[in-house]
């Protein structure tokens, strides 16, 4: 009797496993006759930056967080006073836009400070101050990218503007509309060929990197805003402003410039 029970149990297990495999096979081949199965079950990251016990925007003094901010996504500190994330579709779109703007801001901030740093260390490649570099196109000799006439030599602002509109329009159109290059990949974190260093191979490390990216990206967006204000108020680049402040903190600070700033001068 015991042997019979064991055999029946084994047969039932094999039958269930066969049925499960058959279901997976059918689902996998449903998409246009192609086996395109994807893993949809995700384990929650064990990082302190996720979940209900994650750090909040005011620490222990934070108010009750909205029910739709569960700590599932990176950079969620439970703060949404305006209710911008209440609608799931709007929330998903805003998350994508924020990550994209974060990446552009980090590249832009680096592009604002790096030429000045090189210039301070004796490397000459044209105008180093970021908001003055583009104005060289109006000079008689035009604008040489990286100060090298053998690279891109621009003399028409309209041609540069049109080229950027076309190139960025094509890229953004492809990103929004989709195409074979990114088919089946996550729109924000595609991985694969877009992760040649394999930084996303470890799920827990990848979850931490997402948080670091969004935090540094938000800081970069604020930095870019500060660079814009500095350019208007002081007429200098961020590195030169930093050197001036270190040399004389009393005379060169935000309060001193704000109280003495006269628009148009």
Swiss-Prot record:
Q: Which residues bind chlorophyll a 4?
A: 216
| GO cellular component terms, A-Z | chloroplast thylakoid membrane; photosystem I; photosystem II
Which GO molecular-function terms appear in the entry?
chlorophyll binding; metal ion binding
Q: What is the annotated localization of this protein?
A: Plastid, Chloroplast thylakoid membrane
Binding-site residues for chlorophyll b 5, renumbered to this chain: 164, 261
Record-listed chlorophyll b 3 binding positions = 156, 172
Tell me which Pfam families the record gives. Answer: Chloroa_b-bind
- Which amino acids does the record list as binding chlorophyll a 5? 212, 230
Where does the chain cross the membrane?
99-119, 151-171, 219-239
Q: Indicate which residues the UniProt annotation says bind chlorophyll a 6.
A: 245, 254
Query: Where Phosphothreonine occurs along the chain?
Result: 40
Q: Where does chlorophyll b 1 bind?
A: 57
What modifications does the entry list under PTM / processing? Photoregulated by reversible phosphorylation of its threonine residues.
Q: How is the cofactor bound?
A: Binds at least 14 chlorophylls (8 Chl-a and 6 Chl-b) and carotenoids such as lutein and neoxanthin.
Give membrane topology per the record.
Multi-pass membrane protein
- Which positions bind chlorophyll b 4? 164, 175
Feature: transit peptide = 1-37
Its family remark reads: Belongs to the light-harvesting chlorophyll a/b-binding (LHC) protein family.
What does this protein do, in the record's words?
The light-harvesting complex (LHC) functions as a light receptor, it captures and delivers excitation energy to photosystems with which it is closely associated.
Protein name as catalogued: Chlorophyll a-b binding protein 36, chloroplastic
Instruction: State the organism of origin.
Output: Nicotiana tabacum (Common tobacco)
């Amino acid at each position: 009797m015991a042997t019979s029970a064991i055999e029946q149990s084994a047969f039932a297990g094999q039958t269930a496993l066969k049925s499960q495999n058959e279901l997976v096979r059918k689902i996998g081949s449903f998409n246009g006759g192609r086996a395109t199965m994807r893993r949809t079950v995700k384990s929650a990251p064990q990082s302190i930056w996720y979940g209900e016990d994650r750090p909040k925007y005011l620490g222990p003094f934070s108010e009750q967080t909205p029910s739709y901010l569960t700590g599932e996504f990176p950079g969620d500190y439970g703060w949404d006073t305006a209710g911008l994330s209440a609608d799931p579709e709007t929330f998903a779109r805003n998350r994508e836009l924020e990550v994209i703007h974060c990446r552009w801001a980090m590249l832009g901030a680096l592009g604002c400070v790096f030429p000045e740093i090189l210039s301070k260390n004796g490397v000459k490649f044209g105008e180093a101050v970021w908001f003055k570099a583009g104005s060289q196109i109006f000079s008689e000799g035009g604008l040489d990218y990286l100060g090298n006439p053998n690279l891109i030599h621009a003399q028409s602002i309209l041609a540069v503007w049109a080229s950027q509109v076309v190139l960025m329009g094509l890229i953004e159109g492809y990103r929004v509309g989709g195409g074979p290059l990114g088919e089946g990949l996550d729109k924000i974190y595609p991985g694969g060929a877009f992760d040649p260093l394999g930084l996303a191979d470890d799920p827990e490390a990848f979850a931490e990197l997402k948080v670091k990216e969004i935090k540094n990206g938000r800081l970069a967006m604020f930095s870019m805003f500060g660079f814009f204000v500095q350019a208007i108020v002081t007429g200098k680049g961020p590195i030169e402003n930093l050197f001036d402040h270190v040399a004389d903190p009393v005379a060169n600070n935000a309060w001193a410039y704000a109280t003495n700033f006269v628009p148009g001068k």
